[in-house]
């Protein structure tokens, strides 16, 4: 059985870890980094992921996708999506089913399809380290992700060629990473997770007793559209406004300028965590009839803090709700853990310290803790980690729409999962032969104010007066937090059950097609790699042959020279094309045309060998007169 890997699929950065010798190990990617930017770029002939994609973003802004996690499992008309439509340099579109998709070079793509490219890179990173194929993974999601977003994340895993063994909440994973070595006593931990695109707070009780550990989530809350990207956008808008005041030009209309501005804003934000002021300097940011324009704006830490103050305050309300749901006060919290890159901001740390009345722990890496926790959970599933029990919760209440457009809850938020619940309902009209089960997720009483997860019909109900038929509705949430629903007519025993797919979401056929596309691209990538290899070999041979022709000089007959030159020209022409077989054929013909050249080179080499042999005999003749001397090797440090 192969290893199950742990993946933190982040909004800004992603990370992969595996259990190695009983310990979770964060793996370095091909670029030598422990985290990979969650950025994907599409060019004419390839898909680029991570740091290389980030580097080319300025020149390819409309086909470079970042923060895709903010779109996953969302509808195009959602307010959160509409906010992003106006500020993202790439195109966000409405799919046929109403989902938010993206478009690149005329191709429409679902967010899980794009996210799968990041997961593929994580998979490859793990395979390079382990030296074997990886097919199974534990993937993390924000605790406050709804059913649609969890389903979409699992779809992304499937498209990437991974069997997702478990979806685990990010704060829970961070608590696992923190608590796995704490062997005795009880701790109540608050995990404050402010990442690139999402915010979560989870209150978790860690019970360690005689080697057995239980991680029980008491409550969770959050905002799936609040994170570092929003902090960046505040700074981007400020810089764009200041530039417009000075120059009268709106940079928001120029995608290339906005991409440069985004990179500069992110860099300035990071710098202001360790310094009190910085300068954003972008020469030639744009131009008008009077010539090129340069952006030079000084920013202080205080200015940045004033721009994002309300965002930081927005994170405090979920803290209060989570504590109330767990029936705890701030004094009951033993430790506070910060997760997510945005928690490096001093103002965020100050707000958390003031709220809880204690300093957060500094021994948890905010960028890596979630992946480490995912790897530990992978170890639990594979049996490599024993005596650890993880009890997670569903973040939002689940129920159905009943008469009067009311949401009737079957499972309350913060219920430990997996769990089941059932309730008996009846008909609203006389002789009603079918009922529609409309499944909802949320906390509002009015059905339409909650998230619709889907609906299905139970028909064949025997005619009867309203209120007489008994319809039992069963909700079953699995360990991934994904819902399965059934409805049964208790009189006839007729049953209808479904795994809830969002009223939008990808169909089974769409996911299967995307999996096939990904496999086809894997073949394409392999062929492309082989083509490049053939080109490089052919190019190297031409270079070496030219050199040998020059060295041979007049010893090479002009007839052979012409034949070799024609063969080299043929190779050069073949290299410019995309036909691997044509390149290899031209390469072989050059080798054959160079036969005479090889003979000359070998003869020259043998002649030099003879000269060296004579020199060796002379040296041996005087060897008896030579006295051995002690010597000390002197190493040349300049090498």
Swiss-Prot record:
Acidic residues biased stretches = 625-639
Give GO terms: molecular function aspect only: ATP binding; ATP-dependent protein folding chaperone; unfolded protein binding
State what induces this protein: By stress conditions e.g. heat shock.
Alphabetical keyword list: ATP-binding, Chaperone, Nucleotide-binding, Phosphoprotein, Stress response
> Which Pfam families did the record assign?
HSP70
Superkingdom in the source lineage: Bacteria
Source organism per UniProt: Shewanella baltica (strain OS155 / ATCC BAA-1091)
**What role does it play?**
Acts as a chaperone.
Q: Which family does it belong to?
A: Belongs to the heat shock protein 70 family.
Q: Which residues carry this modification: Phosphothreonine?
A: 198
Kindly provide the name given to this protein in its UniProt entry.
Chaperone protein DnaK
Q: Region entry Disordered: which residue ranges?
A: 602-639
Coiled-coil stretches are none
């Amino acid at each position: 059985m192969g290893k199950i890997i742990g993946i933190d699929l982040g909004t800004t950065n992603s990370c992969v870890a595996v259990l190695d010798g009983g310990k979770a190990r964060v793996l370095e990617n091909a670029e030598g980094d422990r985290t990979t930017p969650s950025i994907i770029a599409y060019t004419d002939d390839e898909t680029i992921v991570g740091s290389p994609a980030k580097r080319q973003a300025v020149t390819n802004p409309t086909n470079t996708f970042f923060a895709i996690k903010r779109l996953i499992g969302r509808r195009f008309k959602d307010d959160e999506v509409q906010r992003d439509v106006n500020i993202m340099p790439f195109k966000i579109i409405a799919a046929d089913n109403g989902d938010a998709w993206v478009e690149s070079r005329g191709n429409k793509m679902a967010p899980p399809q794009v996210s799968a490219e990041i997961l593929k890179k994580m998979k490859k990173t793990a395979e390079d380290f382990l030296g074997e194929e990886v097919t199974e993974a534990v993937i993390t999601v924000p605790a406050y992700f709804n059913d649609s977003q969890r389903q979409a994340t699992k779809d992304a895993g499937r498209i990437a060629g991974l069997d997702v063994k478990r979806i685990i909440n990010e704060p829970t994973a961070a608590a696992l990473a923190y608590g796995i070595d704490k062997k005795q006593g009880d701790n109540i931990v608050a995990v404050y997770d402010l990442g690139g695109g999402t915010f979560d707070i989870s209150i978790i009780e860690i019970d360690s007793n005689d080697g057995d550990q239980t991680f029980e989530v008491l409550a969770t809350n959050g905002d799936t559209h609040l994170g570092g990207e929003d902090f960046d956008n505040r700074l981007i808008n400020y810089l764009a406004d200041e530039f417009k005041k000075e120059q009268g030009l709106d940079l928001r209309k120029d995608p290339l300028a906005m991409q440069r501005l985004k990179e500069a804003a992110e860099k300035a934000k990071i710098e202001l965590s360790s310094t009190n002021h910085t300068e954003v300097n972008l020469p030639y940011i744009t131009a008008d009839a009077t010539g090129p324009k340069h952006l030079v704006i000084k920013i202080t830490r205080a200015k940045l803090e004033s721009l994002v103050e309300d965002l930081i305050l927005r994170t405090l309300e979920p803290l209060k709700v989570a504590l109330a749901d767990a029936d705890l006060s701030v004094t009951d919290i033993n430790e506070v853990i910060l997760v997510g890159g945005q928690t490096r901001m001093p103002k965020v740390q100050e707000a958390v310290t003031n709220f809880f009345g204690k300093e957060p722990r500094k021994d948890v890496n905010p960028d890596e803790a979630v992946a480490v926790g995912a790897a530990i959970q992978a170890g639990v599933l594979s049996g490599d980690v024993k005596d650890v029990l993880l009890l997670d919760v569903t973040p939002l209440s689940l129920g159905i729409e009943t008469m009067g457009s009311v949401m009737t809850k079957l499972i309350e938020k913060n219920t430990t999962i997996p769990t089941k619940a059932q309730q008996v309902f009846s008909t609203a009209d006389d002789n009603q032969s079918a009922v529609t089960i409309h499944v909802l997720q949320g906390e509002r009483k009015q059905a339409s104010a909650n998230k619709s997860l889907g609906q299905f019909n139970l028909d064949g109900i025997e005619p009867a007066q309203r209120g007489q038929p008994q319809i039992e509705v069963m909700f079953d949430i699995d360990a991934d937090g994904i819902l399965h629903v059934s409805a049964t007519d208790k009189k006839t025993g007729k049953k209808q059950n479904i795994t809830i797919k969002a009223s939008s979401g990808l169909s089974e056929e769409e996911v299967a097609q995307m999996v096939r596309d990904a496999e086809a691209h894997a073949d394409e990538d392999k062929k492309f790699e082989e083509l490049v290899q053939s080109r490089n070999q052919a190019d190297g041979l031409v270079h070496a042959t030219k050199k040998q022709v020059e060295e041979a000089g007049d010893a090479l007959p002009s007839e052979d020279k012409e034949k070799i030159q024609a063969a080299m020209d043929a190779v050069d022409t073949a290299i410019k094309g995309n036909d691997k077989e044509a390149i290899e054929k031209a390469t072989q013909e050059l080798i054959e045309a160079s036969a005479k050249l090889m003979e000359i080179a070998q003869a020259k080499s043998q002649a030099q060998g003879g000269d060296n042999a004579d020199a060796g005999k002379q040296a041996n003749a005087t060897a008896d007169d030579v006295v051995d001397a002690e010597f000390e090797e002197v190493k040349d440090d300049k090498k």
